[in-house]
Swiss-Prot record:
It comes from Hordeum vulgare. This is Large ribosomal subunit protein uL14c. Binds to 23S rRNA. It holds the Pfam family Ribosomal_L14. It is found in: Plastid, Chloroplast. Keywords: Chloroplast, Plastid, Ribonucleoprotein, Ribosomal protein, RNA-binding, rRNA-binding. Belongs to the universal ribosomal protein uL14 family.
Length: 123
């Protein structure tokens, strides 16, 4: 569960390394916590030099991994080692061209198919 002030890793090659959540937009209405597949507004806390994204830039991101476990529809419980997000634009397309690490299959159902197609492993 991601809430404001939570630090997240970036799971793509857009140039940012660490994000801090400042607002949970979510999939439906006013939510306090973000789960896998929810959209957040975040600020970049750490970035690589000579990349298009800079430190202290406000961006949108979609949550792809959380430490808090969640139950799939088939009853399997999935838990990841870190909190991670993929940076997206206003239309929901990823800014990076690669996605690192495994992501959940629930993103496919939430119409983030471009992120799912870039991922090396879908659980």
């Amino acid at each position: 569960m991601i809430q404001p002030q939570t630090l997240l890793n970036v799971a793509d090659n857009s140039g940012a390394r660490k994000l801090m959540c400042i607002r949970v937009i979510g999939a439906a209405g006013n939510q306090r916590y973000a789960r896998i597949g929810d959209v957040i507004v975040a600020v970049i806390k750490d970035a690589l030099p000579q990349m298009p994204l800079e430190r202290s830039e406000v961006i949108r991101a979609v949550i792809v991994r959380t430490c808090k476990e969640f139950k799939c529809e088939d009853g399997i419980i999935i838990r990841y080692d870190d909190n991670a997000a993929v940076i997206i634009d206003q239309k929901g397309n990823p800014k990076g061209t690669r996605v690192f690490g495994a992501i959940a299959e629930e993103l496919r159902e939430l119409n983030f198919t471009k992120i799912v197609s870039l991922a090396p492993e879908v659980l």
